[in-house]
Amino acid sequence: GSIVMNEQDISRLDDTGRAAVRRSNLGIIFQQFNLIPSLDVAANIAFQARLAGMYDADSATGLAQALGLADHLHKFPEQLSGGQQQRVAIARALAAKPSLILADEPTGNLDEATAAEVMAQMLALVTKTGAALVMVTHSPRLAGQMGRQLHLRQGQLA
């Protein structure tokens, strides 16, 4: 088999080539945020984009503003609420302008009200950028906001 992303067969690439494709084409949002504790919000947002050679200060600032983080750019993750940390993780995932975003339970650690707010912001930004979003969630409410749903039951697509 093969894996084609943006018209490129990535299954034929070596490890270095696949890593380059991941850095420049994938944005990943983890349930546990996975922010770098020693970096402030601005540096956490910029991290992935810098690795991909795609850093744009204006774009990063725009993401921070769109996610309500403009007043928190010089704070460290431990100084932020869970919702703010997840917003940083979303901004980081979008900063390199990926074509595909993988989100693993992106609101799983948030209360219902914060989850709804963060999800609305994330979906608006994903729509604006034109990226595809693949999200794993146990929440029927969140799944209902997606254009297409696939259900996994006992390891099989149902």
List each language-model region with its residue ranges.
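H-loop (His-switch) and adjacent beta-strand-loop-beta switch element
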Residues: 146-158
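ABC family nucleotide-binding domain
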Residues: 1-145, 149
